[in-house]
């Protein structure tokens, strides 16, 4: 299968547009990245993670999002793929490079599409014999308590390279926090709180102020087809995997599904024990 078969139309924004405008487009178009252009040429990409990263920088906190430009937050080192590249190869590239998506360009470097882990995740919806427990991540889980400061949760998420993490209390799932939720909460704060108070008050925002309560949940013994559908229908990239009484036992994410596709739609072999 080729990239051209599942890529989606690129949504672009000029690098000199306001960062607040980028956030509006991301929300209205229900996507998690925009292609950044200058005079019609590709110069970068901007994602919720980029916006979250920029808005949390200490010297930027006191600046309203309406005064920031896309160029100040975008990623300007962009890896592109071709329409005729194999999906399994692109999935492996994303896993190896820790990328969540990339622009698709033709031989003349014209932008013709975008492919992300979400498009790749859609491919697993026909695999009803593979269970969530076969692919889910169970080790080194990143979780957060609802009363933790949002700025701390933001830093943990960015450092780990996760797009979302379960919100738990005493091992039970209470919600989900994603890059999008953090970016939107920080943008609201930037607009609603006067400049002179932001540096102090930003530390008062808690995870509970931004998180999604009662998120969709996945279960170890349900198929990845069902798990992927829940995730995609909710426009999420991560789902908590729970056992009885909503006890967290893992996460299943677009990264796990992409790894499955990169492995040519095979369940990875268990690692040998020393």
Describe these PLM feature segments.
Residues 12-30, 37, 80-98, 105-106, ...:
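The conserved cystathionine-beta-synthase
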Residues 26, 34-49, 94, 102-118, ...:
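A glycine-centered beta-loop-beta connector
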Residues 1-9, 47-78, 91, 111-143, ...:
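Tandem CBS (Bateman) regulatory domains
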């Amino acid at each position: 299968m080729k990239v051209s078969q599942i890529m989606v139309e690129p949504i672009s924004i000029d690098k000199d547009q306001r960062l607040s405008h980028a956030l509006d487009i991301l929300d209205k178009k229900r996507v998690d990245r925009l292609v950044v252009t200058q005079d019609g040429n590709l110069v970068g990409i901007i994602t919720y993670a980029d916006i979250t990263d920029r808005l949390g920088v200490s010297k930027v906190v006191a600046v309203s999002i309406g005064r920031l430009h896309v160029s100040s937050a975008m990623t300007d080192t962009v890896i592109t793929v071709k329409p005729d590249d194999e999906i399994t190869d692109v999935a492996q590239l994303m896993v190896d490079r820790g990328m969540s998506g990339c622009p698709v360009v033709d031989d003349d470097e014209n932008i013709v599409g975008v492919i992300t882990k979400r498009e790749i995740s859609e491919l697993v919806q026909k695999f009803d014999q593979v269970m969530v427990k076969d692919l889910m991540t169970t080790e080194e889980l990143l979780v957060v308590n609802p009363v933790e400061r949002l700025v701390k949760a933001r830093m943990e998420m960015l450092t780990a390279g996760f797009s979302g993490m379960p919100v738990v209390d005493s091992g039970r799932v209470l919600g989900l926090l994603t890059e999008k939720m953090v970016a939107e909460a920080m943008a609201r704060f930037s607009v609603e709180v006067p400049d002179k108070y932001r540096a102090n008050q930003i530390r008062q925002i808690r995870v509970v102020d931004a998180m999604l309560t009662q998120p969709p949940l996945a279960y170890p013994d349900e198929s990845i087809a069902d798990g992927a559908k829940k995730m995609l229908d909710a426009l999420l990239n991560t789902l908590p995997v729970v056992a009885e009484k909503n006890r967290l036992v893992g996460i299943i994410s677009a990264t796990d599904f992409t790894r499955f596709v990169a492995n040519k739609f095979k369940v990875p072999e268990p690692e040998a024990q020393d």
